[in-house]
């Protein structure tokens, strides 16, 4: 029976490269001269430290542009609240979304059911498996899910016929 898996994963090497490029650009830009802006990767979160809210926003814009250039979806980033750090610094934690949560999996399953195609979806840990008798139905499910804005970065893998 044909099937495929829906997963949400991020290439950590590309994330590391994007962060390194961001740090390099911050060091070279004139508007960041003399500032103490930092971007660090800690397991599955990114810590951004800046002098003020304006510089924090600028650093995050640079980071997002580097992510897009490296084919990492901005949907895979979850932004925490900007908070005061030591001194006059501002800190923001950005979490990388790896895996599909149970709530998102249920939401995706509901979207699949609404298509009224003859396919079944089942939640397996942090991924979703979709099976059906017809490959065309599975391709239609992929098309529908790509068209929906579900606020999650999805990849479709293990397409078996």
Swiss-Prot record:
Source species of the chain: Geobacter sp. (strain M21)
Molecular function via GO: nucleotide binding
Gene3D superfamilies hit by this protein: 3.30.70.860, YajQ-like, domain 2
Superkingdom in the source lineage: Bacteria
Function: Nucleotide-binding protein.
Record bears the keyword rRNA processing: no
Keyword set includes Nucleotide-binding: yes
GO cellular component: cytosol
Similarity comment: Belongs to the YajQ family.
UniProt cross-references to SUPFAM superfamilies, sorted A to Z: YajQ-like
Name this protein carries in UniProt: Nucleotide-binding protein GM21_0633
Keywords for the protein's UniProt record, in alphabetical order: Nucleotide-binding
Pfam families: DUF520
Matching InterPro entries: DUF520 (IPR007551), UPF0234-like_C (IPR035571), UPF0234_N (IPR035570), YajQ-like_sf (IPR036183)
PANTHER family in UniProt: UPF0234 PROTEIN YAJQ (PTHR30476:SF0)
């Amino acid at each position: 029976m044909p099937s495929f898996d829906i997963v949400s994963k991020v290439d950590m090497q590309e994330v590391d490269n994007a962060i390194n490029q961001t740090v390099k650009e911050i060091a070279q830009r004139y508007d960041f001269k003399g500032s103490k802006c930092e971007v660090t990767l800690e397991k599955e979160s990114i810590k951004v430290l800046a002098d003020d809210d304006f510089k924090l926003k600028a650093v995050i814009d640079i980071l997002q542009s580097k992510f897009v250039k490296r084919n990492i979806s901005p949907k895979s980033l979850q932004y925490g609240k900007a908070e005061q750090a030591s001194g006059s610094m501002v800190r923001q934690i950005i979490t990388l979304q790896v895996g599909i949560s149970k709530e998102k999996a249920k939401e995706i399953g509901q979207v699949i059911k609404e298509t009224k195609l003859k396919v079944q979806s089942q939640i397996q840990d942090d991924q979703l498996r979709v099976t059906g008798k017809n490959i065309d139905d599975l391709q239609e499910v992929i098309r529908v899910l790509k068209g929906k804005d579900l606020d999650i970065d999805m990849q479709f893998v293990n397409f078996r016929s």
